[in-house]
């Protein structure tokens, strides 16, 4: 019963962390998709040509579904995997730091567990990702999610819902592996860099909620920035393949086509939007997740 409750706690923490970040940051995701779609439009021109302020939240429902469920599945799967690895050691320790209750692993173990968990969950949520990207773009005039599902199925059948999984996997698996690795390292370094007045302890020697939230969110933001920059080209390739599947048929062709026709810097188009969104999303989601885990410890 304890294991079930613990897993449920991670599911709930991941769900609400992902849901909050998805709704709050949807405009950044939409702008990133449209910047990658168009070769010359600026952020300002896209905003100016939008059909009102609410247009910036177009695609929020599929985004919220994908992010909340994906985050819940990912974080609970990641925890199960990391806990199993940690328990297999003779010197098992279920608390990584004063700011966290997550297991402490080696650099290599954090990298591998993060990548494997993300790859598996990414495949399960791929259909929602495809619907979200097309719903956000201006290439498709979908008026409802059901219309998007029907159109994709009629024109591309089941494979259409998994369009772009290759570059998505190549982007998300390394991203998550690198992120988890950096995040765990950052939680050790950030407290040493913060002014002493921000570091406060409770009677048990753990950080107060305000301190742990600051440490965890700051660590998440810094880690997300670096991991996002490294994997940015695959995000552009993924988006092109999902928006124009008949033109961009595979990862290698898409990569060569973008470099030949638009230049290597185009592979990093939308990076500012993705960087901002991923950093803020990580800060919000992991900050909420870590604290909910502590509140619901059994």
UniProtKB/Swiss-Prot annotation:
The chain crosses the membrane at residues 11-36, 59-85, 111-136, 164-187, 215-241, 270-288. It comes from the Eukaryota. GO terms for molecular function: glycine transmembrane transporter activity. Disulfide bonds: none annotated. It is found in: Mitochondrion inner membrane. Pfam families: Mito_carr. GO terms for cellular component: mitochondrial inner membrane. It catalyses: glycine(in) = glycine(out). Mitochondrial glycine transporter that imports glycine into the mitochondrial matrix. Plays an important role in providing glycine for the first enzymatic step in heme biosynthesis, the condensation of glycine with succinyl-CoA to produce 5-aminolevulinate (ALA) in the mitochondrial matrix. Its main location: mitochondrion. It comes from Vanderwaltozyma polyspora (strain ATCC 22028 / DSM 70294 / BCRC 21397 / CBS 2163 / NBRC 10782 / NRRL Y-8283 / UCD 57-17) (Kluyveromyces polysporus). PANTHER family: MITOCHONDRIAL GLYCINE TRANSPORTER (PTHR46181:SF3). Solcar repeats lie at residues 5-84, 105-189, 211-295. GO terms for biological process: glycine import into mitochondrion. This is Mitochondrial glycine transporter. The keyword Coiled coil does not apply. It is a multi-pass membrane protein. Keywords: Membrane, Mitochondrion, Mitochondrion inner membrane, Repeat, Transmembrane, Transmembrane helix, Transport. The keyword Magnesium does not apply. Belongs to the mitochondrial carrier (TC 2.A.29) family. SLC25A38 subfamily.
């Amino acid at each position: 019963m304890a294991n079930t409750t613990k897993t449920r706690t991670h599911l709930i923490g991941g769900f609400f962390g992902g849901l909050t970040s998805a709704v709050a940051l949807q405009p950044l995701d939409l702008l990133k998709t449209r910047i990658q779609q168009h070769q010359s439009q600026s952020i300002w021109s896209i905003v100016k040509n939008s059909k009102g302020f609410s247009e910036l939240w177009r695609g929020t429902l599929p985004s919220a579904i994908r992010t909340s469920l994906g985050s819940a599945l990912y974080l609970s799967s990641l925890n199960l995997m990391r806990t199993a690895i940690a328990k297999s050691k003779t010197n098992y320790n279920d608390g990584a730091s004063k700011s966290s209750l997550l297991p402490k692993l080696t650099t290599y173990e954090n990298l591998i567990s993060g990548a494997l968990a993300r790859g598996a969950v990414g495949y399960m949520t791929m259909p929602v990702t495809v619907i979200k990207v097309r719903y956000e773009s201006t290439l498709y005039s979908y008026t409802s999610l059901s219309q998007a599902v029907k159109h994709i199925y009629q024109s591309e059948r089941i494979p259409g819902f998994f369009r772009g999984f290759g570059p998505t996997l190549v982007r998300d698996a390394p991203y998550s592996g690198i992120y988890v690795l950096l995040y765990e390292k950052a939680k050790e370094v950030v407290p040493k860099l913060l002014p002493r007045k921000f570091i406060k302890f409770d009677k048990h020697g753990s950080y107060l909620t305000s301190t742990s939230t600051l440490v965890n969110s700051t660590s998440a933001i810094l880690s997300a920035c670096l991991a996002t920059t490294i994997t940015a080209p695959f995000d552009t390739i993924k988006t092109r393949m999902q928006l124009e599947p008949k033109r961009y048929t595979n990862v290698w062709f898409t990569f060569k086509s973008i470099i030949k026709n638009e230049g290597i810097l185009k592979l990093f188009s939308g990076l500012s939007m993705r960087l901002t969104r991923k950093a803020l999303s990580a800060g919000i989601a992991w900050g909420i997740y870590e604290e909910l885990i502590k509140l619901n410890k059994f």
